[in-house]
Design a protein with these regions (language model features):
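Short, surface-exposed beta-strand/strand-loop-strand elements in extracellular ectodomains
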Residues: 48-63
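Surface-exposed loop/edge segments in extracytoplasmic proteins
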Residues: 2-4, 63-72
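Solvent-exposed serine/threonine-rich low-complexity stretches and specific carbohydrate-binding patches
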Residues: 9, 68-78
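Short amphipathic, basic-aromatic surface patches that mediate peripheral association
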Residues: 38-47
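C-terminal interaction-tip segments
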Residues: 1-16, 33, 101-117
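Exposed aromatic-hydrophobic patches
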Residues: 22-26, 80-89
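Noncatalytic modules at the cell exterior or secretory-pathway interfaces
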Residues: 32-39, 88-109
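Tryptophan-centered short beta-strand motifs
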Residues: 11, 16, 21, 64-69
Length: 117
């Protein structure tokens, strides 16, 4: 099985709290595979209002269905591990990795989507 980087980039948060999520990569991606998501969260900081982010992965059960949350994580303040890694997820019908900053100071996050094919 080959391992590859499916997509990567840098996401700059708006002024927290952000009203909506921002997709990392292509929203509604229909590429089949086993994926892991990596986000550099080393910029998260503690403070009077600690930085906080919400991460979601959405997927459809059927290709004609509605994308719904299949995995969700909340990170608050400085993290012991500077890179957040999702579990491996089998995705295929229309999936999205998305993030929003809910509190603190607007931060920049590098991210990578890794695929096993």
């Amino acid at each position: 099985m080959a391992i590859s980087e499916h997509a990567s980039g840098t996401r700059t948060a708006g002024t927290p709290p952000e009203a909506g999520f921002t997709a990392l990569g292509t929203g509604g991606d229909t590429t089949d595979g086993v994926f892991q998501f990596y986000i550099d969260v080393s910029n998260l900081a503690n403070g009077a209002t600690s930085d906080a982010i919400e991460i979601q992965v959405l997927e459809k059960v059927l290709s004609s269905g509605t994308a719904r949350v299949v995995f969700e994580a909340y990170l608050i303040g400085a993290q012991d591990e500077p890179i957040w890694v999702s579990p491996a997820l089998l995705l295929l019908h229309g999936w999205t990795l998305q993030i929003k900053q809910t509190a603190g100071t607007a931060r920049t996050y590098d991210w990578s989507i890794r695929k096993v094919a």
